[in-house]
């Protein structure tokens, strides 16, 4: 008869493994959750793998155990648990209780002892036992009907390694019970079990394989045949330290007689997905686990189903639906093409909790156009819908995805299921789980209607309503028009430059082969590292797991003394330019010879726009080769490019927000701010500031905006860390209110876990209290910079809205074609140049009133490079 199976889990061990194996996660409230998330994934994986219905979890109690009485220094060398991990222990225990899972804990004993006791008890009761732990100490429990399962999580993926007695012997060369003696000899630094001084794993294994126990080994330690290979003193070491070995054995032995028992039937894996557990899963935003909890939900609690919806094919019924919508002057709307129906466009209309329609656009264009003339409507991902049917521009349509983005800009998705979970407390199937395109449209219209009130209220509660209404929403049609217009490319010039690059790459390749004395794959870091640091014996080689590091910072230090390195860096530059720009850009040129990229409004945490397909914001500008690529972007015939760029916008904002009198005065006098800073920081008269001092001051000025450290500045300027530290200190002495302002932003972040821009945009900082120094320091730097960078993003977005509006009012044919952070590029009809230039400069400079005025530099050219 097949034995029933039970899963016994080492709670702290698996939580810890998961914490270090899963990238850091937190929910919108800043609660760290990666350990819990990883634990649950391991739990579900083990349950499926073992096909069991019985589970229990053991935890350590944060109090001394019997082992501490034996040896007060037990585990004394362990570092304290990181705060982010410690926080997750009670949260996980709360969740497991709500999942009706037995939690096993007892003062004076470790989880290992409880697991050992219960495992042996269950085996004696005729059960098959699987003990899940990240601790190999439990291998001693392995038995005929007790399997030890050790999961290892890396990069979010979990692999499970299983051990019955034969597996333990195969890997360690000893039986499970002998594993205790092995540890007694070699010790365990993680638990501060001393072992026999100087005795490593190989020596200990030889001894236990031959003598089976430390007691037997001790009895034969002086025998002539007690000859451990390459360790002649092993017998003597054991004799002299036998008391230590015995103590170590006692510490390493799992106590299987803990006064605890477990009722097998209490461990039944059922009703774990109930309203209480699901509430925590939603709160912690474990999106990928929602469906698992929903599927397991009891029949009394069903997954939300869509209200009955009508697939309208009758023109008369379509008119009735739109008549109802027009009467209430409000609806959830979503427009979508159905690829399974030849790309046919459908309108999804939600009028209430119970009235939901799918109507072919061809059946209701007139009605929809009429509907949009009055009232307000709600949708998701509005810009994508503009591309399907431009007439949507005529209506007052609110994009709730944008609102959700402002409320939590750290998320990577603002689809219907995200909004349902966050603002309706509903779990909906994700896009990949849907049966057809219609369901996505129906859910999107339904969620748009249902989530609107809560999203709008939260925008008001967080003082971001004006930002949403006056900046983000009006920007959507502007970005649509930019995408639709695209930017013209001289494809012939682009391909010609690509051919030139290929020739240079081929020539450099031959030169590198010649210098190396053989052919190899220059693009392979492993092969390149072998050539440079083994064959050619170049200094400074940093060995990694996969070979030598050939990162840019490593090679740049060698290029002056070793010509081959300079050629390699040049080769890499040309190769990247060719693949990313020459070939990459040409793939995006459409039949109209224009690139129609995408501008993403809901990607960055600071509010900056992001350019994709292709990324036109990162085309190099400071190199000659980068400028050549900019030159292939040209205006249409009869037009020119007008480029407007804010001058030092972030430094001007720093001066304005900090209210530092010296900085403000320098800008008001139109002084060279870098020369002024050099004079202040290096204590030299203004007229004696050298180009080098100005360069260093410039690095300090821009570095301060980004919360630069002494180390970062020293690396950037190739100076000592002490010098860099002094530069920063002198800067803050010269501009004390800047220091006061930046410290104030960090203090605000510590109190509120977010910072905000001048326009109220919030940048959450969930790791501002992280125990990990690197993560905490990064959050502090973001706290200093995000209000400045975010305000700059808000300013140019608002300027874009004004410029677009003014161009429309003046009936101009000119248009914005690109936004590159602090820069706008317009394709301007020559006859409109002066008018458009005035509109552009005025809008950008007067978008907000600040102590330090915003200054815009505008230039004209026949290609993008000329215009910049």
Which residues are covered by each model-predicted region?
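C-terminal polymerase-core module
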Residues: 506-510, 514-565, 733-781, 785, ...
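Conserved "right-hand" nucleotidyltransferase catalytic core of DNA-directed polymerases
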Residues: 241-363, 376, 441-621, 634, ...
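Extended two-metal-dependent nuclease catalytic cores across DNA- and RNA-processing enzymes
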Residues: 2-4, 25-27, 76-257
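Conserved catalytic core of nucleic-acid polymerases
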Residues: 484, 596-597, 601-604, 679-812, ...
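Active-site-proximal helix-loop-helix substrate-binding element of RNase H-like nuclease domains
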Residues: 155-159, 165-183, 307, 341-461, ...
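Function-dense linear segments that define catalytic or interfacial modules
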Residues: 350-353, 401-430, 442-447, 601-685
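Conserved RNase H-like, two-metal-ion catalytic cores of nucleic-acid enzymes
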Residues: 6-7, 11, 17-56, 72-73, ...
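Active-site palm subdomain of RNA-directed nucleic acid polymerases
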Residues: 459-471, 475, 795, 799-820, ...
């Amino acid at each position: 008869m097949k034995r029933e199976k039970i899963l016994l889990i080492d709670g702290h061990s698996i939580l810890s493994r998961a914490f270090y194996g899963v990238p850091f996660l937190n929910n919108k409230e800043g609660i760290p959750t990666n350990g819990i998330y990883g634990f649950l994934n391991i739990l579900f994986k083990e349950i499926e793998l073992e096909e069991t219905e019985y589970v229990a979890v053991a935890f350590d109690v944060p109090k001394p155990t019997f082992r501490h009485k034996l040896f007060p220094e037990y585990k004394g060398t362990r570092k304290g648990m990181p705060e982010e991990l410690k926080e997750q222990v009670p949260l996980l225990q709360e969740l497991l209780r709500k999942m009706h899972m037995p939690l096993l804990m007892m003062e004076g004993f470790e989880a290992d002892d409880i697991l050992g006791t219960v495992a042996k008890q269950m085996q004696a009761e005729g059960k098959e036992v699987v003990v899940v732990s990240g601790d190999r100490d439990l291998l001693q429990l392995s038995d005929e009907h007790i399997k030890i399962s050790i999961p290892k999580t890396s990069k979010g993926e979990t692999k499970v390694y299983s051990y019955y007695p034969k597996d333990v012997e195969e890997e360690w060369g000893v039986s499970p019970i002998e594993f205790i003696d092995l540890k007694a000899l070699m010790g365990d630094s993680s638990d501060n079990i001393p072992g026999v001084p100087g005795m490593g794993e190989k020596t200990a294994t030889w001894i236990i394989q031959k003598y089976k126990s430390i007691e037997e080994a001790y009895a034969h330690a002086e025998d002539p045949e007690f000859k451990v290979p390459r360790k002649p003193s092993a017998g003597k070491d054991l004799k002299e330290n036998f008391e230590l070995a015995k103590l170590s054995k006692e510490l390493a032995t799992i106590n299987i007689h803990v006064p605890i028992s477990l009722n097998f039937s209490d461990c039944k894996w059922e009703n774990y997905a109930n309203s209480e557990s699901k509430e925590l899963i939603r709160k912690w935003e474990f999106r990928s686990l929602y469906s698992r909890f929903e599927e397991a939900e009891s029949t009394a609690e069903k997954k939300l189903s869509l209200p009955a919806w009508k697939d309208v094919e009758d023109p008369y019924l379509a008119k009735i639906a739109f008549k109802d919508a027009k009467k209430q002057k409000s609806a959830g709307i979503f427009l979508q093409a159905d690829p399974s129906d030849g790309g046919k466009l459908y309108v999804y209309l939600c009028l209430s909790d119970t009235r939901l329609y799918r109507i072919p656009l061809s059946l209701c264009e007139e009605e929809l156009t009429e509907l949009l003339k009055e009232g307000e409507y709600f949708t998701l991902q509005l810009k994508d819908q503009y591309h399907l049917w431009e007439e949507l521009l005529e209506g007052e349509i609110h994009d709730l995805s944008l609102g959700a983005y402002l409320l939590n800009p750290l998320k990577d998705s603002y689809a219907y299921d995200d909004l349902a979970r966050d603002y309706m407390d509903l779990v909906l199937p994700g896009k990949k789980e849907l049966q057809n395109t219609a369901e996505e449209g129906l859910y999107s219209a339904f969620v748009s209607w249902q989530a609107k009130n809560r999203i709008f209220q939260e925008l008001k509660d967080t003082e971001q309503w004006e930002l949403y209404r006056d900046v983000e929403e009006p920007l959507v049609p502007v970005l649509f028009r930019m995408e639709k217009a695209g930017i013209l490319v001289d494809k012939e010039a682009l391909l010609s430059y690509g051919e030139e690059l290929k020739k240079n790459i081929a020539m450099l390749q031959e030169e590198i082969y010649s210098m190396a004395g053989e052919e190899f794959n220059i693009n392979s870091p492993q092969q390149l590292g072998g050539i440079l640091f083994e064959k050619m014996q170049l200094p400074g080689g940093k060995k990694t797991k996969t070979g030598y590091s050939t990162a840019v910072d490593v090679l740049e230090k060698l290029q002056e003394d070793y010509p081959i390195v300079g050629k390699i860096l040049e080769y890499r530059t040309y190769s990247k330019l060719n693949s990313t720009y020459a070939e990459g850009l040409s793939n995006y040129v459409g039949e109209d010879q224009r690139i129609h990229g995408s501008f993403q409004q809901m990607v960055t945490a600071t509010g900056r726009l992001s350019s994709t397909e292709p990324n036109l914001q990162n085309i190099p500008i400071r190199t000659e080769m980068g400028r050549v690529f900019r030159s292939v972007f040209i205006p249409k015939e009869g037009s020119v490019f007008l480029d407007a760029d804010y001058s030092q916008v972030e430094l001007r904002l720093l001066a304005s927000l900090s209210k530092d009198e010296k900085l403000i005065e320098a800008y008001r006098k139109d002084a060279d701010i870098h020369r002024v800073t050099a004079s202040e920081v290096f204590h030299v008269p203004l007229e004696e500031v050298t180009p080098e001092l100005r360069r260093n001051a410039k690095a300090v000025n821009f570095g301060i905006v980004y919360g630069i450290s002494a180390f970062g500045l020293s690396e950037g300027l190739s100076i000592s860390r002490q010098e860099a530290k002094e530069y920063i200190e002198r800067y803050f002495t010269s501009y004390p209110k800047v220091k006061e302002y930046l410290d104030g932003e960090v203090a605000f972040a510590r109190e509120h876990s977010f910072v905000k821009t001048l326009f109220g945009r919030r940048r959450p900082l969930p790791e501002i209290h992280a125990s990990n120094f690197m993560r905490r320091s990064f959050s502090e730097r973001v706290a200093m910079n995000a209000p400045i960078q975010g305000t700059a993003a808000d300013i140019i977005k608002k300027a874009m809205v004004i410029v677009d509006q003014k161009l429309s009012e003046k009936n101009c044919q000119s248009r914005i074609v690109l936004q590159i952070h602090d820069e706008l590029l317009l394709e301007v009809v020559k006859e409109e140049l002066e008018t458009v230039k005035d509109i552009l400069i005025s809008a950008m400079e007067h978008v907000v009133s600040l102590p330090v005025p915003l200054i815009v530099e505008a230039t004209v050219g026949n290609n993008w490079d000329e215009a910049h």
